Structure formats: structure tokens, C-alpha cells
Regions:
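N-terminal, positively charged nucleic-acid-binding surface of large information/translation enzymes
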Residues: 1-146
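Structured secondary-structure scaffolds
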Residues: 1-5, 53, 58-62, 110-215
Length: 215
């Protein structure tokens, strides 16, 4: 067993919070790591094998390598996107994810999770062809019944995928706090696409020392 933990430090939420505290995003992230997250691990007596930050050079290197491979293989394309964006969730929302605001936000659509107004964003993005993987995933789940456990979650995910996967906007050009898209320096990678890759970058993906990843 190899226990990994760490911090997700990119995105608009960190950028805005840092600005509100008159510090750079990196300085704000450093404060959170050193004053809150690492001390918390000591408090709860967690004996993790590694701690990775998404601002670590090893993570950025691995993410860049992964992204470039997707692009070279034709799984990323440029397009226009407009949608409801929640800064708190750091993701675009469907109309069904919104509720009517109350109090100071009466008359506005707000995020059902954070109860704050969403922003309508329209920008040129790069998209990941997630729709290309719909049948591949269903075939994987069918041929490997134990791949997702428990069964209730497996059934939920299969039902979700069967509804149809849409291509995912994976870049932002309205701010610069993130990992730069390697073929277009005007864009940074969408925070969720970046952060989830820590599970493989911590194992050395994209580096010369990738024995743990290959194992």
C-alpha cells in the first residue's frame, strides 16, 4: 500500500482569494499548505508516503506531457463554449444544477451547493473528446464487473455514461493561474483536469524516474 495525499492549488477560486488577501496565488497556496494542511496530517496522525502539490514542478511536467500526448493523438480540439460557471465549485453547471436565489441574490440563479450566483462565461476553449470514450468505458465495465465497487455505485456510473458523454472544455483564457497549455500560452488547463492527474504524476509519469508508475 502506498498512501498519497496533497493539495489542489490552481483555479480561479485560489486566484480570487489570494487577490482578496493582497498576496500572489502561490504565496496563498504556500500558506494553506504550511499553516493548515500539513499540520492537519500531524494532528490526525496520518502516515502518508508522499505529499504532492499541483504547483510542484514534477506535477506540472507530468501534466504537460499527458496533455501534449492527448493533443498529438487528436483527442483535443479548439472550440467556443458558453455556460454557467460557479467559482466555488470551479466548474460549469447545468441549468438543473441551479436554484432561485433568495435574500441578496433574489432574482438570480445560484449554485445549489454554494448558494452564490453563477457567472455566464463565453470564451474560446480547448475541448477533450470525452464522447469518444463512451463506448470504451461501457465495454470496460461489462468485461470487468468488479472494476467499480460497490455495485450500487457501478450501476449509477453505468447509467450516467449511457446517458451520453459530452466533450469537456479543459482550458481557460480569462486568467493565468494554472498550468499553461503547451501549444498555446494564452490558455491554462482547467483545474479539475489538472488536479486529478496527481495520482499518476506522483508516481513519476512524465519523468525519467517513472518506475513506480510503470509498476
Amino acid at each position: 500500500t502506498w498512501l498519497l495525499t496533497g493539495t489542489d492549488e490552481h483555479g480561479q477560486k485560489i486566484l480570487r482569494t489570494a487577490s482578496a488577501n493582497d498576496v500572489s496565488p502561490k504565496e496563498w497556496a504556500d500558506r494553506l499548505v504550511n499553516d493548515a494542511w500539513k499540520p492537519l496530517l500531524d494532528t490526525v496522525d496520518v502516515a502518508n508516503d508522499d505529499f504532492i502539490r499541483t504547483t510542484d514542478e514534477r506535477h506540472e511536467r507530468g501534466v504537460t506531457a499527458f496533455l501534449q500526448k492527448l493533443y498529438d493523438d487528436g483527442f483535443i480540439y479548439a472550440g467556443e463554449f458558453e455556460g454557467f460557471y460557479c467559482v466555488g465549485c470551479e466548474e460549469y453547471k447545468q441549468p438543473s444544477d441551479l436554484v432561485a436565489g433568495t435574500g441578496a441574490y433574489e432574482g438570480q440563479q445560484v449554485c445549489a451547493i454554494h448558494s452564490i450566483p453563477v457567472e455566464v462565461l463565453a470564451e474560446r476553449n480547448y475541448f477533450f473528446r470525452m464522447s469518444d470514450f463512451e463506448q470504451r468505458l461501457l465495454d470496460l465495465y461489462e468485461s470487468n464487473p468488479l472494476f467499480i465497487q460497490p455495485e450500487s455505485v457501478r450501476n449509477e456510473i453505468i447509467s450516467f455514461v449511457k446517458q451520453g458523454l459530452r466533450d469537456l472544455a479543459i482550458s481557460r483564457s480569462s486568467f493565468d493561474w494554472g498550468i499553461t497549455i503547451p501549444w498555446d500560452s494564452d490558455h491554462v488547463l482547467y483545474v479539475w483536469f489538472d488536479a486529478l492527474l496527481n495520482y499518476v504524476t506522483a508516481l513519476g509519469y512524465g519523468s525519467d524516474d517513472d518506475e513506480a508508475f510503470r509498476r
